[in-house]
Amino acid sequence: MKGLIQRVRGARVEVAGEIVGAIDNGLLALVAVEPEDTPEHADKLLHKLLNYRVFSDEQGKMNRSLKDIGGGLLLVSQFTLAADTRNGMRPSFSTAAPPALGAELFDYLLQRAQGQHPDVASGRFGADMQVHLVNDGPVTFMLQI
């Protein structure tokens, strides 16, 4: 399971012109599910999303987590992060989970996040989404579980 996280001042996801998820200050997490992933992988990713220290403390050091600042978490499914780009000029998606498994584990991650954090929003799995964000820093990390 992969999570590309970006520290944001705000972010929103639209589907067909309708805002389906939005946060203010917090993290945007683009999430890819791979074939071998399990609910345990999702739990580990969620733990990192909530506790990874990417927000500045009083001294300007990245020493505070999403939980520490009470920020929002916007989860967006993005199977393209699981692409194999090592060969050729076209990505291969054979390394991404089948849609049914991807949907199941993304929904599991979303439900667990909503149960553990007060400000969680999401995109719509499998939809053509437009993601708008204001990067803060920019601060971007790839988390791999």
Curated annotation (Swiss-Prot):
Reactions catalysed, as given in the entry: glycyl-tRNA(Ala) + H2O = tRNA(Ala) + glycine + H(+); a D-aminoacyl-tRNA + H2O = a tRNA + a D-alpha-amino acid + H(+)
Lineage top rank: taxon: Bacteria
Single GO MF annotation: D-tyrosyl-tRNA(Tyr) deacylase activity
Keywords, in A-Z order: Cytoplasm, Hydrolase, RNA-binding, tRNA-binding
Main subcellular localisation: cytoplasm
SUPFAM superfamilies per UniProt: DTD-like
Keyword match Repeat: no
InterPro entries: Daa-tRNA_deacyls_DTD (IPR003732), DTD-like_sf (IPR023509)
EC number(s) on file: 3.1.1.96
GO CC annotations, alphabetized: cytoplasm
UniProt-annotated location(s): Cytoplasm
Motif range (Gly-cisPro motif, important for rejection of L-amino acids): 137-138
GO terms classed as biological process: D-amino acid catabolic process
Keyword Ribonucleoprotein appears in the UniProt entry: no
Role noted for this protein: An aminoacyl-tRNA editing enzyme that deacylates mischarged D-aminoacyl-tRNAs. Also deacylates mischarged glycyl-tRNA(Ala), protecting cells against glycine mischarging by AlaRS. Acts via tRNA-based rather than protein-based catalysis; rejects L-amino acids rather than detecting D-amino acids in the active site. By recycling D-aminoacyl-tRNA to D-amino acids and free tRNA molecules, this enzyme counteracts the toxicity associated with the formation of D-aminoacyl-tRNA entities in vivo and helps enforce protein L-homochirality.
The protein's assembly and partners: Homodimer.
Similarity annotation: Belongs to the DTD family.
HAMAP family named among the record's database cross-references: Deacylase_Dtd (MF_00518)
Domain comment (free text): A Gly-cisPro motif from one monomer fits into the active site of the other monomer to allow specific chiral rejection of L-amino acids.
Stated name of the protein: D-aminoacyl-tRNA deacylase
Organism expressing this protein natively: Pseudomonas entomophila (strain L48)
